[in-house]
């Protein structure tokens, strides 16, 4: 067995760019004829993917799998924590939900099971791809001194696998020298030799402007600076919902404006990536307390805590704005938890969704739907035939608790019952909801929906013969890898 030295991407902080740099590294190694194996022992994210076997994993590891030329599998992210609010997270081990954990008890109750899940994930990866090279991503900072003893996914894993580590620092946020020197100073003596290089990320301007800083870092740390990556923040959307606050809307000339509700428990906002890539429209994030305005459509993404987000809609007055918008002929598209919010009634007998009690809870009443949370979580990929806004094959995945029932007045979105419904409104608008994550990845479906909006404004239709958004993602990964190969010297990192 030709077992290659694992590589690991660590960061001086959260948001340093570890996920993208890991994806870039995977694509570069794949180009060179290797089989990179992306792996993040523990991730905390509500942006999830469902693999072909119905296992749940972080979307960032799915993206890294595509970069590596692989189909995503949940072994690549054996521990996933999905925040629910109030310092509580759903715990996913090996793609399956195994319970809830409070922050203050997590390391006491879940450290040993988590480490076991990580070891099992590694075993699965190495058995499936015995000649591959593990490319690991760390989490947050590797030197949080109050957490180091129970670290699951940074230096414990690097030592366990004897990985060569690359330390990534984000210069855009300032303080990059203190970040790097401080991180290296807090490493234990046995950990310091694992760091083979430093990568400066998100540098603006000419690279030679950093030459003096590069020399200083190498002189004061003894660790080579392997590269200075340029600002590529617009290439991929952010992994974490907090980073959405930094997103700036497209301010160029556009034909359509779509308002997206940014509620506290937003999840699976990767559903919006295909719209971000559409040059003819502008996405505008609407936070609680903002004015909804008069967009061409409103999109309600998924929610990890539907009832909590419902309360936010009501307390902020966004519920009244949405109702007025729909009554006056507005168009709405809601995905998963967003669709549940639009319904007439929600029941939560197991109190899974952040409400105070079992309900029933009145929804926004914009679609005649009834939802009951509970039971086994629906986790599966789907390939179905769309019936609205046109007949076309579509694919995606389900990821939700409970079931939803519709009145006979609604029309199905596709030929599989229970996946979504739509209706025209008396004022000429349209309201639609679906459980199918990834719906907008389907190019022909997305363009048909956009063309409905364009027709209402008297605009010419867009071509509908587009490939799946995965093709666009592939092109972005190629551009990312091009930049990585141009600006980063991997030689020290790839030493045996």
UniProtKB/Swiss-Prot annotation:
One Pfam family named in its UniProt record: GATase_3
Protein known as: Cobyric acid synthase
Keyword Isomerase found: no
tRNA-binding in keyword set: no
PANTHER family according to UniProt: COBYRIC ACID SYNTHASE (PTHR21343:SF1), DETHIOBIOTIN SYNTHETASE (PTHR21343)
Domain GATase cobBQ-type residue range list: 255-445
Transmembrane segments: none
Record function comment: Catalyzes amidations at positions B, D, E, and G on adenosylcobyrinic A,C-diamide. NH(2) groups are provided by glutamine, and one molecule of ATP is hydrogenolyzed for each amidation.
Molecular function via GO: ABC-type vitamin B12 transporter activity; catalytic activity
Active site (UniProt): 336, 437
Keywords from the UniProt entry: Cobalamin biosynthesis, Glutamine amidotransferase
Residues spanning the signal sequence: none
InterPro entries: Class_I_gatase-like, CobQ/CobB/MinD/ParA_Nub-bd_dom, CobQ_GATase1, CobQ_synth, GATase_3, P-loop_NTPase
Entries under HAMAP family matching the protein: CobQ
């Amino acid at each position: 067995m030709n077992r290659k030295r694992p590589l690991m991407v660590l960061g001086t902080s959260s948001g340093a760019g570890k996920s993208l740099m890991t994806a870039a590294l995977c694509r570069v190694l794949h180009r060179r004829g290797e089989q990179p194996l992306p792996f993040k022992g523990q991730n905390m994210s509500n942006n999830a993917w469902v693999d072909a076997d119905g296992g749940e994993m972080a979307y960032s590891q799915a993206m890294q799998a595509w970069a590596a030329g692989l189909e995503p599998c949940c072994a690549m992210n054996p521990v996933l924590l999905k925040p629910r609010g109030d310092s509580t997270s759903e715990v996913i081990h090996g793609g399956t939900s195994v319970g809830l954990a409070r922050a203050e008890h997590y390391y006491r109750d879940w450290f040993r099971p988590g480490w076991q899940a990580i070891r099992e994930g590694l075993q699965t990866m190495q058995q499936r791809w015995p000649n591959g090279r593990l490319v690991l991503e760390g989490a947050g900072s590797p030197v949080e001194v109050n957490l180091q003893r129970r670290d699951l996914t940074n230096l414990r894993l690097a030592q366990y696998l004897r990985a060569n580590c690359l330390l990534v620092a984000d210069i855009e946020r300032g303080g990059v020298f203190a970040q790097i020197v401080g991180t290296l100073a807090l490493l234990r003596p046995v950990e310091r030799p694992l760091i083979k290089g430093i990568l400066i990320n998100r540098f603006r301007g000419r690279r030679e402007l950093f030459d003096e800083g590069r020399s200083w870092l190498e002189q004061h740390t003894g660790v080579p600076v392997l590269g200075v990556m340029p600002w590529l923040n617009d290439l991929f959307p952010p992994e974490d919902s907090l980073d959405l606050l930094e997103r700036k809307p497209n301010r160029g000339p556009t034909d359509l404006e779509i308002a997206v509700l940014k509620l506290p428990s937003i999840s699976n906002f990767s559903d919006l990536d295909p719209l971000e890539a559409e040059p003819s429209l502008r996405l505008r994030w609407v936070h609680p307390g903002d004015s909804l305005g008069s967009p061409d459509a409103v999109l309600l993404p998924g929610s990890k805590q539907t009832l909590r987000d419902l309360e936010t809609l009501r307390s902020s007055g966004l519920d009244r704005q949405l109702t007025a918008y729909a009554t006056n002929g507005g168009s709405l598209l809601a995905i998963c938890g967003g669709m549940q919010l639009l319904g007439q009634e929600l029941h939560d007998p197991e109190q899974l969704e952040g409400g105070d009690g079992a309900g029933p809870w009145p929804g926004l009443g914009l679609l005649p739907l009834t939802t009951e949370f509970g039971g086994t979580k629906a986790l599966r990929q789907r390939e179905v035939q769309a019936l609205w806004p046109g007949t076309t094959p579509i694919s995606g995945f389900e990821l939700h608790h409970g079931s939803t029932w519709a009145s006979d007045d609604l029309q199905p979105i596709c030929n599989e019952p229970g996946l979504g419904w739509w209706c025209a409104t008396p004022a000429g608008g349209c309201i639609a909801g679906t459980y199918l994550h990834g719906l907008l990845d389907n190019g022909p479906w997305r363009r048909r929906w956009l063309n409905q909006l364009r027709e209402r404004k008297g605009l010419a239709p867009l071509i509908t013969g587009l490939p799946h958004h995965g093709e666009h993602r592939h092109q972005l990964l190629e551009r990312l890898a091009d930049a990585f190969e141009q600006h980063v010297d991997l030689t020290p990192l790839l030493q045996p």
